[in-house]
Amino acid sequence: MIIAVYPGTFDPLTRGHEDLVRRAATLFDKVVVGIAHSRNKKPFFTIEERVDIAREVLGHYPNVEVHSFGGLLKDFVRDQNGRVIIRGLRAVSDFEYEFQMAGMNRHLLPDVETMFMTPSDQYQFISGTIVREIAQLGGDVSKFVFPSVERWLQAKAKERREQSAQGGA
């Protein structure tokens, strides 16, 4: 059984992410979507919310699982018996960072391959950061995320606006 691990923050999960998962699910026996705790970022959604969102969107794929992880990716990949790490490349600007990470992962996990996948053409420009910003400003994100994710974004953006109006975090 060949297991692929697709790690990321998925904050939020976009149509581009789902596109890669859908295509990877046809290539591998199992795809594990690993949602990172993101210690170096300030996520819009909590880790629990990101896992719930991903499970809502991806739950209909029989060979896809969603789990959260903290710590090193190498440990998560080992725990999942992963043989391949999937990384998405939207643009040439993504390549340098991803190439360095693939080299480090090869050093830490010599028997695990990194596979770069590009999103389908209609999703190449989508990023979670841009989607979050549009949602926070009240814009339409329906072309970039699934309806359930749009509802999560609207609710979280409203919650944040209310907190700001009250002087909260």
Curated annotation (Swiss-Prot):
Catalysed conversion reaction: (R)-4'-phosphopantetheine + ATP + H(+) = 3'-dephospho-CoA + diphosphate
Question: What is the protein name for this chain?
Answer: Phosphopantetheine adenylyltransferase
Record-level GO BP terms: coenzyme A biosynthetic process
Cofactor(s) annotated in UniProt = Mg(2+)
Residues that bind substrate: T9, K41, L73, R87
What are the EC numbers?
2.7.7.3
Which pathway does it operate in? Answer: Cofactor biosynthesis; coenzyme A biosynthesis; CoA from (R)-pantothenate: step 4/5
Species of provenance: Bordetella pertussis (strain Tohama I / ATCC BAA-589 / NCTC 13251)
One of the Pfam families matching this protein, by short name: CTP_transf_like
Primary role: Reversibly transfers an adenylyl group from ATP to 4'-phosphopantetheine, yielding dephospho-CoA (dPCoA) and pyrophosphate.
Its subcellular locations are:
Cytoplasm
Q: Relate the assembly described in the record.
A: Homohexamer.
